[in-house]
């Protein structure tokens, strides 16, 4: 669950919370914090504890640990609440909830206008109140989604703040405040080469700048003024941010900021309308800005080796020229529905993520030639029925997942020449077919699909015959009924002589 701490990300906080019960009154035994792991438990975090204590020996001091325990009460309480409320909704669900709330508000305004224009205005206030109450009731579910997302977002910030707080407590305990001040001090290093480049650009137009491997920690704002720049290579530096002024590079075609320490990209990156190649791999990005969708000329986007959990909801609607998308080694749980609109996409690598499936729109990627979905492990269990529509697919890697059955129309992937299905609990097709290779798999799935279609056609024909039989019976019955009605009508219309017996008095 999202509430579980990763010792690698929060080493001190994990250590303190694991030992929290030893500093808690017996009456609080119902706390959500687990007792310290047993040394005999093979899944124990004892190795982590030994490692962190070795690195930070003062953690074992009771006074230090007690101070840290008091500083983690908010984390424990929040974690308990989130465990009750459930996991964080994905980005697309949140976006849809926001959109639905806007639609509801717009509908409410229209309702008020209709009520105000109604001829009977006596009950206007009452009608408006009832409508408002109904709308608020409808909004509860969508608001709860947004609220849950906000709680999880706040919890993640809380964890980071708590970890930093505990580190400060520890450093204060060992009287190492000087190191903290040194780490927090802003260090600006712009070497002579950077200054020289800026001076050269002021005198003569530059179309290419390569500053890779220079250990740069800062990119000067002045770079945004080199308007003739076409290629900017900042690979393998120590950059923590890209200045907003990069939006001034209106003619930029290629931007490489891979292998840095970037945690975010500026929203202004969306103003690079001519950008064709963007490499942001090997950073610390958790999201891509929504504005990246405005880079409509992008042909290649490499966002691999980051901490992304989702892609922008509308990325497929606007990046229609994208041919190559690299998002492997992230933490992406789902792909947006809009990805099906990337009709130019030929290469997609999404291995080593947390994908739990693909949207039905995925089958619209009819130009896709290479697809790697391997190593999504237990999260990826099936593929959409539209998967068979990927008619241009040549290479497919589905290894190391939990797929039990390939889609029925898999046999229609006539251009598929390379297929990896290793480490899947496949039932359809059976293992003996898989071992024979890609052609055997396609043939097996193709025959299976044809058999299914023939069976469906047979059932449809039987149904048509039954319907026809019922129609014939109904026609005959209707004909008989019409004949009977006609005979009765003729009899009544002939006015037979009245029976004298009926005229007798009782």
From Swiss-Prot:
Tissue: Widely expressed.
Annotated SUPFAM superfamilies: L domain-like
Coiled-coil stretches noted in the UniProt entry, renumbered to this chain: 143-193
Motif GVYW, residue numbers: 437-449
LRR repeats: 203-225, 226-249, 251-272, 273-295, 297-319, 320-342, 344-364, 365-389, 390-412, 414-436
Region Disordered, residue ranges: 24-48
Phenotype of gene-disrupted mutants: No visible phenotype. Pirl1 and pirl9 double mutant is lethal due to a male-specific transmission failure leading to a severe pollen malformation.
Alphabetical list of Pfam families matching this protein: LRR_8 (PF13855)
InterPro entries (alphabetical): Leu-rich_rpt, Leu-rich_rpt_typical-subtyp, LRR_dom_sf, LRR_domain-containing
Signal peptide annotation: none
A single GO BP: microgametogenesis
Record-linked SMART domains: LRR_BAC, LRR_TYP
Keywords: Coiled coil, Leucine-rich repeat, Repeat
Family recorded in the similarity comment: Belongs to the SHOC2 family.
Cited function: Leucine-rich repeat protein that likely mediates protein interactions, possibly in the context of signal transduction. PIRL1 acts redundantly with PIRL9 in the differentiation of microspores into pollen.
Name of the featured protein: Plant intracellular Ras-group-related LRR protein 1
The organism of origin for this protein: Arabidopsis thaliana (Mouse-ear cress)
Classification of source organism: Eukaryota, Viridiplantae, Streptophyta, Embryophyta, Tracheophyta
Gene that produces this protein: PIRL1
